[in-house]
Amino acid sequence: MVKSGQIRFPDYRWGEDRLFIFDCLERAGSVAVLPECKYSYIMHPGQSLISSYYDKKFEVCLAADTRAQQLCRRFGAEDDEDFRYMFAKSVFSCLTTLFSPGCRLNRNEKRDVIRGIITNEQLRERSRKPFGGAAVKLLSAVMRSGSVTLNYAAFRFVAWAGQAAPRFFTKLKHRK
């Protein structure tokens, strides 16, 4: 199915592809790297899955991280720093998209979502030893602070910075 391009995911969701890949890895008897790409995204002009608000994004983020941790344990990975980095960036996306034009939540609803995210035990555990550059470490510390107001202000600023200086923002967020 993979070789013939027969796998399709629902349009404009977040995370189904990661969960599918993790499920496949867990069930695979062997894994081979194909010489050409068999995976392509359909990108709609002006839209990005990372920058779009999706109300279940954090739930999918937690599920993908849980699966990644399970696979690391199963295959005896010494360190899961790349997965911790991916998780941190995914959570940052959950928080910054609260301030995107597509998010219709009011201020109090956004604060409730932030509270739910920053008090989540999995997030608190995984953000203790963040892997990444200064931006990842700083934003992880903000999340661990437990302050809804600080997180609201910080991630609102991050969302604004991403719109005001997208190239600089992209370089900064991809620094490991």
Model segments located where?
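Catalytic-loop motifs flanking and including active-site residues across diverse enzymes
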Residues: 20, 64, 87
